[in-house]
Amino acid sequence: MYFELKENKPHGTKDDPFSTYHIKNEGRSFQIPVHWHDELEIIYVKSGFLTVSISGENYIGTPGDAFVVSPGTLHFMGSQAGEVDYFTFLFPLEYISFCTDDMLDDKLLTPLKNGHLMIRPRIKDAAKELCEQLAEIYMAKNDEKKLEIAVQIK
């Protein structure tokens, strides 16, 4: 692990650990530096073209594409085209755990957290729909809807 590349920015709060970032870049190329963090991250491309690199694998995200970055995984994103609109959703794996020490924790969440299991970066169509809903909720900034989606995720 490259400790010097760890992103030290806190994401979320104790009461609301789910963080959403909306990045709308118009007209200039940019790159978010290579980094890693303890949270799971979902990257959703709303419009434009986004270069996403996850564990050294490069992808070109187009409108509707979504990617998963496992905790502790080196990644970066950027755009040479200049115009891109995308969202990142970050949350600790505990956010989707029922803390019951069940099969979900044993077979999925604990191995993900410990770096022993990697999720394929490209997300399938059903999960893309969830990303679109999350983006719409963020854009509406509706706290009641945020709670509703949190309940659906859990």
Q: What do the PLM-derived regions correspond to, one by one?
A:
Residues M1-I60, D106, L117:
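Generic protein-terminus/edge-of-domain signal
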Residues Y2-F18, L74-Y138:
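A hydrophobic/aromatic-rich effector-binding and dimerization subdomain
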Residues G56-P71:
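Short acidic-glycine-tyrosine-enriched beta hairpin
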Residues A135-E148:
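Basic, amphipathic alpha-helical hairpins
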